[in-house]
Amino acid sequence: MMVRNNILPKIRRHGAVLVLAVLVGIIYGSHHFFIVRELGTNGGNYRPLTFASHADASVYGIRANAVYYGQWLAGDISVPEQSGNPSILPLLNPMLMGGLGRLLGSLDRALILSDFLFPPLIFIGLYFLAFELTRRRALAIFFATFFIFIPEAVLSIPPITRSLLHTLLQRILPNASDILYFVRFEYPKITFLFSLPALYGLLRAIRWDTDERWSTWLAGIFFGLMFY
């Protein structure tokens, strides 16, 4: 009962971010429905990840596919003679996506579900990270919303030169054909799931007005997982 009394007020206090997270998931995942509908009228088959979708697919996609078919330690499988050697890339990212595919019975389903699930989780993490820094819900929501859709624009802030201003305007008003930033995997759609909790836990742990142990554990666990 005490846990319930402590959790419910916090949920109500931050309820808006949960509603917005659902909207983020719909926006990030909606393109799958539009593409399927378009292909359906033309008799095509839909694959959510192709080499044409993004250059990263040539490396990351085949690693997730290898895990899906049972090779849990997916090394540099794009080069046959290196496939059995230690991986120079993190192993946990393809394990997460490939394992989700095995759970759902299809890697395509895993890729589609990840667009509905992972960006909202990242959005919530961004919100609580910003709230920890500002203690203002409105500012935290603004930052999380801004970052989840146009994170690269942050690199041009403040626009103190004409070049930075031009770059900022380009990134705020992207091309309609560009993919959303957190659709890409492994980076940043999966890697942010580990870096955000690590940073949030670190901020909580170093606050002078708290002696929480869970924040130290959170920072330590996810900081360690970032290397895998």
List each language-model region with its residue ranges.
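Membrane-interface transmembrane helices that cradle and orient dolichyl/undecaprenyl
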Residues: I190-S215
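N-terminal membrane topogenic signal
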Residues: N6-L20
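Active-site lumenal/periplasmic loops and adjacent helix-entry segments of GT-C-fold
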Residues: Y28-P197, F227-Y228
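Hydrophobic membrane-insertion alpha-helices, especially the h-region
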Residues: L18-Y28
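Membrane-interface alpha helices of multi-pass inner-membrane proteins
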Residues: W214-Y228
